[in-house]
Amino acid sequence: MSKPANTTSTIIPCLRYRNALAMIDWLCEAFGFQKHTVYAEGDNVHHAQLVFGNGMVMLGSTSNAGEWGQAIVQPEEIGGRETQSACVIVTDADAHYARAVAAGATIVIDIADQPYGGRGYACKDPESHHWWFGSYDPWAEPAQA
């Protein structure tokens, strides 16, 4: 069996967007991502990497899907549903929530304290990809009962 690579993040969600260039800017404004790299020709994004802390998402244009991207559909193509979503750990869930709402994110689950710890909320971006943001850190030591 192959071992994980010795790198910052070994699991990186990949997304496809109809207007990837606009979504890159929106994800940075609304969620606080930072551009790591963007390979584009005109409006067509071949590949982009956005970072948040030590995590990353990769994305590209639906019009340039290639063999791998053809297996990935837009949420609106399947009734607005997702088969998976990114969960992002933030230090201040309330401040992040306010930032996302101000940028026009659609709130799916309002911000609340979670029974397993932390505070969080779920939202959709303008192209209906679902995101979870919260302060619960699954890597932290469990609280003593």
Q: What residues fall within each predicted segment?
A:
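Short, surface-exposed ligand-recognition loops at beta-strand->loop->(often short) alpha-helix junctions
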Residues: 16-19
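Vicinal oxygen chelate
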Residues: 1-14, 24-124, 135-145
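C-terminal catalytic core of tyrosine-transesterase DNA break-rejoin enzymes
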Residues: 127
